[in-house]
Amino acid sequence: MALQPAAGARDLNPHQVETNRNITERLARVFRLWGYDEVSPPRVERMKTLMAGGAIASRDIVRLVADDPLGLRPEMTASIARAACTRLATRPRPMRLWASGTVFRSRAADEGGQCIEENLQSGVELFGVAAIEAEMELLSLLMASIASLKLGPSTQPRLLLGHTQLMELILSPYEGPKRDAVRWALVHFDRLAVETMELLPNERKTLLSLMECRGTPKDVLQQLRHLFGQQPVFEDLDRLCSLLSKTALEQDIALQLDPTFQPQFELYTGLVFQLVCNGRSAPVVLARGGRYDELVQRCGAPENQAFGAGFSLAIDPIRELLVEDESAKADTTDVLVAYSSNSNLETALDHQQQWHAKGHSAVLELQPIRSMDEAQALAQARGDLQLDWVDL
Protein backbone atom coordinates (compact mmCIF):
# COMPACT_ATOMS: atom_id res chain seq x y z
CA MET A 1 0.00 0.00 0.00
CA ALA A 2 1.33 3.45 -0.96
CA LEU A 3 1.76 5.69 2.09
CA GLN A 4 2.22 8.95 0.16
CA PRO A 5 -0.53 10.84 -1.72
CA ALA A 6 -0.31 11.17 -5.48
CA ALA A 7 2.11 13.79 -6.81
CA GLY A 8 0.49 17.20 -6.36
CA ALA A 9 -2.24 15.97 -4.00
CA ARG A 10 -2.16 16.73 -0.28
CA ASP A 11 -3.89 15.87 2.97
CA LEU A 12 -5.57 18.65 4.94
CA ASN A 13 -5.66 18.62 8.72
CA PRO A 14 -8.91 19.31 10.63
CA HIS A 15 -8.10 23.00 11.21
CA GLN A 16 -7.38 23.53 7.50
CA VAL A 17 -10.64 21.83 6.56
CA GLU A 18 -12.58 23.92 9.07
CA THR A 19 -10.95 27.12 7.82
CA ASN A 20 -11.73 26.23 4.19
CA ARG A 21 -15.36 25.63 5.14
CA ASN A 22 -15.53 28.92 6.99
CA ILE A 23 -14.09 30.81 4.00
CA THR A 24 -16.52 29.23 1.52
CA GLU A 25 -19.48 29.87 3.82
CA ARG A 26 -18.43 33.50 4.27
CA LEU A 27 -18.22 33.94 0.49
CA ALA A 28 -21.53 32.13 0.00
CA ARG A 29 -23.28 34.64 2.27
CA VAL A 30 -21.95 37.48 0.12
CA PHE A 31 -22.98 35.77 -3.12
CA ARG A 32 -26.52 35.21 -1.82
CA LEU A 33 -26.80 38.84 -0.75
CA TRP A 34 -26.15 39.79 -4.38
CA GLY A 35 -28.88 37.45 -5.67
CA TYR A 36 -26.73 34.55 -6.91
CA ASP A 37 -28.14 31.01 -6.82
CA GLU A 38 -25.97 28.00 -6.02
CA VAL A 39 -25.36 25.25 -8.57
CA SER A 40 -23.20 22.13 -8.39
CA PRO A 41 -21.46 21.26 -11.68
CA PRO A 42 -20.10 17.71 -12.07
CA ARG A 43 -16.47 16.95 -11.37
CA VAL A 44 -16.34 14.61 -14.37
CA GLU A 45 -17.14 15.98 -17.83
CA ARG A 46 -16.58 15.08 -21.45
CA MET A 47 -13.24 16.29 -22.74
CA LYS A 48 -14.92 18.44 -25.40
CA THR A 49 -16.72 20.39 -22.67
CA LEU A 50 -13.64 20.74 -20.48
CA MET A 51 -11.48 21.98 -23.36
CA ALA A 52 -14.02 24.78 -23.97
CA GLY A 53 -13.64 24.74 -27.73
CA GLY A 54 -9.84 24.71 -27.59
CA ALA A 55 -9.51 27.47 -24.98
CA ILE A 56 -8.06 24.99 -22.47
CA ALA A 57 -5.23 22.68 -23.58
CA SER A 58 -5.80 18.95 -23.15
CA ARG A 59 -2.46 18.68 -21.31
CA ASP A 60 -3.95 20.76 -18.46
CA ILE A 61 -6.80 18.28 -17.95
CA VAL A 62 -6.62 15.13 -15.81
CA ARG A 63 -7.97 12.42 -18.12
CA LEU A 64 -9.92 9.40 -16.93
CA VAL A 65 -9.62 5.90 -18.36
CA ALA A 66 -13.07 5.29 -19.83
CA ASP A 67 -14.80 4.31 -23.07
CA ASP A 68 -15.77 7.96 -23.62
CA PRO A 69 -13.08 10.68 -23.48
CA LEU A 70 -13.69 12.01 -19.95
CA GLY A 71 -11.71 14.18 -17.58
CA LEU A 72 -11.76 15.99 -14.24
CA ARG A 73 -12.70 19.66 -14.46
CA PRO A 74 -9.71 22.07 -14.46
CA GLU A 75 -12.15 24.92 -13.73
CA MET A 76 -15.93 25.21 -13.36
CA THR A 77 -16.85 27.91 -15.87
CA ALA A 78 -17.23 25.61 -18.89
CA SER A 79 -19.46 23.18 -16.98
CA ILE A 80 -21.66 25.96 -15.60
CA ALA A 81 -21.91 27.60 -19.04
CA ARG A 82 -23.01 24.26 -20.53
CA ALA A 83 -25.70 23.89 -17.86
CA ALA A 84 -26.80 27.52 -18.31
CA CYS A 85 -27.36 26.92 -22.04
CA THR A 86 -29.12 23.55 -21.66
CA ARG A 87 -30.93 22.63 -18.44
CA LEU A 88 -31.20 26.28 -17.35
CA ALA A 89 -31.83 27.74 -20.81
CA THR A 90 -35.44 28.73 -20.02
CA ARG A 91 -34.54 30.75 -16.92
CA PRO A 92 -34.76 34.52 -17.38
CA ARG A 93 -31.65 36.58 -18.02
CA PRO A 94 -29.62 38.02 -16.44
CA MET A 95 -28.96 34.72 -14.65
CA ARG A 96 -26.71 34.76 -11.60
CA LEU A 97 -25.10 31.51 -10.43
CA TRP A 98 -22.42 30.57 -7.93
CA ALA A 99 -20.62 27.32 -7.15
CA SER A 100 -17.96 25.96 -4.85
CA GLY A 101 -15.91 22.82 -5.38
CA THR A 102 -12.62 21.16 -6.21
CA VAL A 103 -10.84 21.59 -9.53
CA PHE A 104 -8.01 19.44 -10.88
CA ARG A 105 -5.16 20.42 -13.16
CA SER A 106 -2.47 18.29 -14.73
CA ARG A 107 1.11 19.37 -15.22
CA ALA A 108 4.47 17.73 -15.77
CA ALA A 109 6.25 16.92 -12.51
CA ASP A 110 9.83 18.11 -12.01
CA GLU A 111 11.06 14.52 -11.92
CA GLY A 112 8.94 13.56 -14.94
CA GLY A 113 5.51 12.01 -15.13
CA GLN A 114 2.17 13.57 -14.27
CA CYS A 115 1.47 15.85 -11.33
CA ILE A 116 -2.14 16.49 -10.33
CA GLU A 117 -2.95 19.79 -8.64
CA GLU A 118 -6.12 19.72 -6.56
CA ASN A 119 -7.58 23.07 -5.48
CA LEU A 120 -10.77 24.31 -3.85
CA GLN A 121 -12.54 27.20 -5.59
CA SER A 122 -15.62 29.32 -5.06
CA GLY A 123 -16.95 31.67 -7.70
CA VAL A 124 -19.81 33.31 -9.58
CA GLU A 125 -21.05 33.47 -13.17
CA LEU A 126 -23.35 36.09 -14.72
CA PHE A 127 -25.12 35.19 -17.97
CA GLY A 128 -27.07 37.27 -20.47
CA VAL A 129 -25.56 40.77 -20.06
CA ALA A 130 -23.64 42.14 -23.05
CA ALA A 131 -22.65 45.56 -21.75
CA ILE A 132 -19.96 46.69 -19.31
CA GLU A 133 -22.58 46.67 -16.54
CA ALA A 134 -21.89 42.93 -16.09
CA GLU A 135 -18.23 43.56 -15.29
CA MET A 136 -19.18 46.48 -13.05
CA GLU A 137 -21.39 44.20 -10.96
CA LEU A 138 -18.89 41.35 -10.89
CA LEU A 139 -15.91 43.43 -9.82
CA SER A 140 -18.01 45.20 -7.19
CA LEU A 141 -19.01 41.74 -5.94
CA LEU A 142 -15.35 40.69 -5.94
CA MET A 143 -14.52 43.72 -3.79
CA ALA A 144 -17.32 42.80 -1.37
CA SER A 145 -16.07 39.21 -1.26
CA ILE A 146 -12.52 40.30 -0.44
CA ALA A 147 -13.84 42.65 2.26
CA SER A 148 -15.64 39.72 3.90
CA LEU A 149 -12.37 37.80 4.19
CA LYS A 150 -10.71 40.51 6.33
CA LEU A 151 -7.23 40.01 4.91
CA GLY A 152 -4.43 41.73 6.79
CA PRO A 153 -2.78 44.94 5.47
CA SER A 154 0.50 43.08 4.86
CA THR A 155 -1.12 41.21 1.95
CA GLN A 156 -1.15 44.42 -0.17
CA PRO A 157 -3.85 43.26 -2.64
CA ARG A 158 -3.59 44.40 -6.27
CA LEU A 159 -6.35 44.08 -8.85
CA LEU A 160 -4.74 43.54 -12.24
CA LEU A 161 -6.98 44.44 -15.20
CA GLY A 162 -6.59 43.68 -18.89
CA HIS A 163 -8.78 43.42 -21.97
CA THR A 164 -8.53 41.26 -25.07
CA GLN A 165 -9.45 44.26 -27.23
CA LEU A 166 -6.37 46.09 -25.96
CA MET A 167 -4.22 43.23 -27.17
CA GLU A 168 -6.06 43.27 -30.51
CA LEU A 169 -5.25 46.97 -30.91
CA ILE A 170 -1.58 46.29 -30.23
CA LEU A 171 -1.45 43.34 -32.66
CA SER A 172 -3.50 44.99 -35.44
CA PRO A 173 -0.44 45.99 -37.57
CA TYR A 174 0.85 42.40 -37.67
CA GLU A 175 -0.27 39.24 -39.47
CA GLY A 176 0.52 35.54 -39.54
CA PRO A 177 3.56 34.16 -37.69
CA LYS A 178 4.83 37.64 -36.81
CA ARG A 179 1.55 38.42 -35.05
CA ASP A 180 1.86 35.20 -33.01
CA ALA A 181 5.49 35.97 -32.17
CA VAL A 182 4.68 39.51 -31.04
CA ARG A 183 1.80 38.28 -28.91
CA TRP A 184 3.96 35.62 -27.26
CA ALA A 185 6.69 38.15 -26.48
CA LEU A 186 4.22 40.62 -24.95
CA VAL A 187 2.38 38.04 -22.84
CA HIS A 188 5.65 36.58 -21.53
CA PHE A 189 7.31 40.00 -21.11
CA ASP A 190 10.23 38.91 -23.28
CA ARG A 191 12.09 42.11 -24.15
CA LEU A 192 14.91 40.19 -25.83
CA ALA A 193 12.46 38.59 -28.27
CA VAL A 194 11.11 42.02 -29.23
CA GLU A 195 14.60 43.49 -29.60
CA THR A 196 15.75 40.66 -31.93
CA MET A 197 12.54 40.43 -33.98
CA GLU A 198 12.41 41.74 -37.55
CA LEU A 199 10.54 44.97 -36.91
CA LEU A 200 10.64 48.56 -38.06
CA PRO A 201 12.39 50.84 -35.55
CA ASN A 202 9.18 52.66 -34.64
CA GLU A 203 7.33 49.32 -34.22
CA ARG A 204 10.02 48.02 -31.87
CA LYS A 205 9.97 51.25 -29.89
CA THR A 206 6.17 51.09 -29.55
CA LEU A 207 6.16 47.45 -28.42
CA LEU A 208 8.91 48.03 -25.87
CA SER A 209 7.04 51.02 -24.46
CA LEU A 210 3.84 48.95 -24.26
CA MET A 211 5.67 46.30 -22.26
CA GLU A 212 6.29 49.00 -19.65
CA CYS A 213 2.76 50.40 -19.97
CA ARG A 214 1.24 49.18 -16.74
CA GLY A 215 0.10 51.19 -13.76
CA THR A 216 -2.88 53.22 -12.63
CA PRO A 217 -5.80 52.97 -15.09
CA LYS A 218 -5.89 56.74 -15.60
CA ASP A 219 -2.23 56.96 -16.64
CA VAL A 220 -2.31 53.84 -18.82
CA LEU A 221 -5.47 54.88 -20.65
CA GLN A 222 -3.91 58.27 -21.34
CA GLN A 223 -0.90 56.56 -22.95
CA LEU A 224 -3.13 54.23 -24.97
CA ARG A 225 -5.23 57.13 -26.27
CA HIS A 226 -2.03 58.83 -27.39
CA LEU A 227 -1.03 55.69 -29.35
CA PHE A 228 -4.39 54.51 -30.71
CA GLY A 229 -6.74 57.47 -30.52
CA GLN A 230 -10.17 57.26 -28.96
CA GLN A 231 -11.59 53.70 -28.78
CA PRO A 232 -14.89 52.40 -27.29
CA VAL A 233 -13.00 49.99 -25.03
CA PHE A 234 -11.24 52.94 -23.39
CA GLU A 235 -14.59 54.44 -22.39
CA ASP A 236 -15.73 51.13 -20.86
CA LEU A 237 -12.52 50.75 -18.89
CA ASP A 238 -12.67 54.37 -17.76
CA ARG A 239 -16.21 53.89 -16.47
CA LEU A 240 -15.36 50.61 -14.75
CA CYS A 241 -12.25 51.92 -13.03
CA SER A 242 -14.02 55.09 -11.90
CA LEU A 243 -16.60 52.88 -10.18
CA LEU A 244 -13.96 50.71 -8.51
CA SER A 245 -11.60 53.48 -7.42
CA LYS A 246 -13.53 54.53 -4.31
CA THR A 247 -14.00 50.99 -3.00
CA ALA A 248 -10.41 50.11 -3.85
CA LEU A 249 -9.17 53.10 -1.87
CA GLU A 250 -11.33 52.16 1.13
CA GLN A 251 -10.05 48.57 1.08
CA ASP A 252 -6.46 49.52 0.26
CA ILE A 253 -6.55 47.57 -3.02
CA ALA A 254 -4.28 48.89 -5.77
CA LEU A 255 -5.78 49.04 -9.28
CA GLN A 256 -3.40 48.25 -12.13
CA LEU A 257 -4.20 48.24 -15.85
CA ASP A 258 -1.93 46.18 -18.11
CA PRO A 259 -2.79 46.08 -21.85
CA THR A 260 -0.56 43.01 -22.39
CA PHE A 261 -2.02 40.93 -19.55
CA GLN A 262 -3.57 37.64 -20.70
CA PRO A 263 -4.70 34.78 -18.41
CA GLN A 264 -3.55 31.15 -18.44
CA PHE A 265 -6.72 29.81 -20.08
CA GLU A 266 -7.79 31.43 -23.34
CA LEU A 267 -11.46 31.45 -22.36
CA TYR A 268 -11.85 35.18 -22.32
CA THR A 269 -13.03 37.57 -25.03
CA GLY A 270 -13.23 40.86 -23.17
CA LEU A 271 -12.21 42.08 -19.75
CA VAL A 272 -9.78 39.84 -17.83
CA PHE A 273 -8.60 40.34 -14.26
CA GLN A 274 -6.65 38.85 -11.39
CA LEU A 275 -6.44 39.73 -7.73
CA VAL A 276 -2.88 39.24 -6.48
CA CYS A 277 -1.65 39.46 -2.90
CA ASN A 278 1.69 39.18 -1.17
CA GLY A 279 2.07 35.67 0.20
CA ARG A 280 4.48 34.53 2.87
CA SER A 281 7.26 34.00 0.34
CA ALA A 282 5.92 35.11 -3.06
CA PRO A 283 2.88 36.80 -4.68
CA VAL A 284 -0.21 34.58 -4.90
CA VAL A 285 -3.30 34.83 -7.12
CA LEU A 286 -6.46 34.84 -4.99
CA ALA A 287 -9.02 35.46 -7.74
CA ARG A 288 -9.24 35.49 -11.51
CA GLY A 289 -11.98 35.96 -14.05
CA GLY A 290 -13.30 37.81 -17.06
CA ARG A 291 -15.79 37.78 -19.93
CA TYR A 292 -16.27 34.65 -22.05
CA ASP A 293 -19.01 35.34 -24.63
CA GLU A 294 -17.55 32.94 -27.21
CA LEU A 295 -17.72 30.04 -24.76
CA VAL A 296 -21.41 30.70 -24.11
CA GLN A 297 -22.00 30.87 -27.87
CA ARG A 298 -20.27 27.49 -28.35
CA CYS A 299 -22.57 26.03 -25.71
CA GLY A 300 -25.54 26.80 -27.96
CA ALA A 301 -26.94 30.02 -26.50
CA PRO A 302 -29.03 32.12 -28.90
CA GLU A 303 -27.30 35.21 -30.26
CA ASN A 304 -29.21 37.61 -28.02
CA GLN A 305 -28.18 35.65 -24.90
CA ALA A 306 -24.62 34.55 -25.75
CA PHE A 307 -22.96 36.61 -23.02
CA GLY A 308 -21.18 35.46 -19.89
CA ALA A 309 -18.69 36.70 -17.32
CA GLY A 310 -17.52 35.53 -13.93
CA PHE A 311 -14.69 34.98 -11.49
CA SER A 312 -13.41 32.36 -9.08
CA LEU A 313 -11.59 32.68 -5.76
CA ALA A 314 -8.86 30.21 -4.78
CA ILE A 315 -9.68 29.03 -1.26
CA ASP A 316 -6.38 27.33 -0.36
CA PRO A 317 -4.17 30.42 -0.91
CA ILE A 318 -6.69 32.52 0.99
CA ARG A 319 -6.49 30.08 3.90
CA GLU A 320 -2.71 30.39 3.98
CA LEU A 321 -2.99 34.19 4.22
CA LEU A 322 -5.32 34.01 7.20
CA VAL A 323 -2.62 33.53 9.82
CA GLU A 324 -5.13 33.02 12.59
CA ASP A 325 -8.73 32.68 11.53
CA GLU A 326 -10.64 33.26 14.73
CA SER A 327 -13.97 32.60 13.05
CA ALA A 328 -12.82 29.09 12.16
CA LYS A 329 -12.90 28.29 15.86
CA ALA A 330 -16.16 27.09 17.31
CA ASP A 331 -18.30 29.70 19.02
CA THR A 332 -19.19 27.17 21.71
CA THR A 333 -17.12 25.66 24.52
CA ASP A 334 -15.31 22.42 23.73
CA VAL A 335 -15.88 19.84 26.46
CA LEU A 336 -14.22 16.57 27.39
CA VAL A 337 -16.62 14.18 29.11
CA ALA A 338 -14.65 11.71 31.24
CA TYR A 339 -15.87 9.22 33.84
CA SER A 340 -14.40 7.30 36.75
CA SER A 341 -14.64 3.63 37.59
CA ASN A 342 -17.50 4.56 39.95
CA SER A 343 -19.61 5.48 36.91
CA ASN A 344 -20.00 4.00 33.43
CA LEU A 345 -19.97 4.84 29.74
CA GLU A 346 -23.78 4.95 29.54
CA THR A 347 -23.96 7.77 32.09
CA ALA A 348 -21.13 9.63 30.36
CA LEU A 349 -23.01 9.37 27.05
CA ASP A 350 -26.03 11.01 28.73
CA HIS A 351 -23.79 13.90 29.82
CA GLN A 352 -22.40 14.24 26.30
CA GLN A 353 -25.88 14.40 24.80
CA GLN A 354 -26.87 17.09 27.30
CA TRP A 355 -23.96 19.23 26.09
CA HIS A 356 -24.96 18.60 22.47
CA ALA A 357 -28.56 19.64 23.24
CA LYS A 358 -27.19 22.99 24.45
CA GLY A 359 -25.28 23.44 21.19
CA HIS A 360 -21.85 22.71 22.65
CA SER A 361 -19.18 20.50 21.13
CA ALA A 362 -18.37 17.62 23.48
CA VAL A 363 -16.10 14.62 23.05
CA LEU A 364 -16.17 11.46 25.13
CA GLU A 365 -13.30 9.57 26.76
CA LEU A 366 -14.24 5.94 26.17
CA GLN A 367 -12.26 4.37 29.04
CA PRO A 368 -12.63 5.16 32.77
CA ILE A 369 -10.06 7.55 34.26
CA ARG A 370 -8.49 6.87 37.66
CA SER A 371 -8.82 10.39 39.07
CA MET A 372 -10.20 13.84 38.35
CA ASP A 373 -6.65 15.27 38.28
CA GLU A 374 -5.70 12.79 35.58
CA ALA A 375 -8.85 13.69 33.63
CA GLN A 376 -8.05 17.41 33.97
CA ALA A 377 -4.54 16.85 32.64
CA LEU A 378 -6.00 14.91 29.72
CA ALA A 379 -8.43 17.76 28.95
CA GLN A 380 -5.60 20.30 28.93
CA ALA A 381 -3.44 18.09 26.72
CA ARG A 382 -6.24 17.89 24.16
CA GLY A 383 -6.48 21.62 23.68
CA ASP A 384 -7.42 23.04 27.08
CA LEU A 385 -10.92 21.58 26.95
CA GLN A 386 -13.49 22.11 29.67
CA LEU A 387 -13.80 18.96 31.76
CA ASP A 388 -17.12 17.33 32.61
CA TRP A 389 -16.14 14.80 35.28
CA VAL A 390 -18.67 11.99 35.81
CA ASP A 391 -17.98 10.24 39.12
CA LEU A 392 -21.36 8.74 40.02
From Swiss-Prot:
This function is generally fulfilled by the C-terminal part of HisG, which is missing in some bacteria such as this one. Its main location: cytoplasm. GO terms for cellular component: cytoplasm. Belongs to the class-II aminoacyl-tRNA synthetase family. HisZ subfamily. GO terms for molecular function: histidine-tRNA ligase activity. It comes from Synechococcus sp. (strain CC9902). Gene3D superfamilies: Bira Bifunctional Protein, Domain 2 (3.30.930.10). This is ATP phosphoribosyltransferase regulatory subunit. Heteromultimer composed of HisG and HisZ subunits. Pfam families: tRNA-synt_His (PF13393). PANTHER family: HISTIDINE--TRNA LIGASE, MITOCHONDRIAL-RELATED, HISTIDYL-TRNA SYNTHETASE. InterPro entries: aa-tRNA-synth_II, aa-tRNA-synth_II/BPL/LPL, HisRS-like_core, HisRS/HisZ, HisZ. Required for the first step of histidine biosynthesis. May allow the feedback regulation of ATP phosphoribosyltransferase activity by histidine. The gene is hisZ.
